[in-house]
């Protein structure tokens, strides 16, 4: 005759977080073993590609993991992939170059260079700094 199984938890529905499988114990009994969800690798914030060099884990496990398992040692490591970071660095460099060229052109034409206006502190912020 088949051995009957009793649930270890109260939830009886077959939901994503309540998957079970039957396991035989060393004592010969059949019991339910609750299966954990599959671990995933974090994705790039821009292109949604899996980040390489990061250990797959559940979000609740990540605070207990050491830093070297969660990131790679580079700017935006663990947030952006290498391709998106490269694009961002190049774009920032080109924008800076455009600003420099604009200033040089203005100097050649003899026009005074317009500087961005200074942000004045509000009365509240000024009183706090004193």
UniProtKB/Swiss-Prot annotation:
GO terms for biological process: translation. It comes from the Eukaryota. InterPro entries: Ribosomal_eL34 (IPR008195), Ribosomal_eL34_C_sf (IPR038562), Ribosomal_eL34_CS (IPR018065), Ribosomal_L34e_arc-type (IPR047868). One of its GO terms (molecular function) is structural constituent of ribosome. GO terms for cellular component: ribonucleoprotein complex; ribosome. Transmembrane segments: none annotated. The keyword Mitochondrion does not apply. Residues 111-130 are annotated as: Disordered. Disulfide bonds: none annotated. Keywords: Ribonucleoprotein, Ribosomal protein. Belongs to the eukaryotic ribosomal protein eL34 family. HAMAP family: Ribosomal_eL34 (MF_00349). This is Large ribosomal subunit protein eL34.
């Amino acid at each position: 005759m088949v051995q009957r199984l009793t649930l270890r938890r109260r939830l009886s529905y077959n939901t994503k977080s309540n998957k079970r499988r039957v396991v035989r114990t060393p004592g010969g009994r059949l019991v339910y073993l609750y299966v954990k969800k599959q671990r995933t690798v974090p994705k790039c914030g821009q292109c949604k590609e899996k980040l390489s060099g990061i250990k797959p884990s559940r979000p609740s496990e990540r605070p207990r993991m050491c830093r070297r398992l969660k990131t790679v040692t580079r700017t935006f490591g663990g947030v952006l992939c290498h391709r998106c970071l490269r694009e961002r660095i190049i774009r920032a460099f080109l924008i800076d170059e455009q600003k420099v060229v604009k200033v040089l052109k203005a100097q050649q034409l003899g026009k005074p260079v317009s500087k961005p206006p200074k942000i004045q502190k509000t009365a509240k912020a000024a009183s706090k700094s004193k």
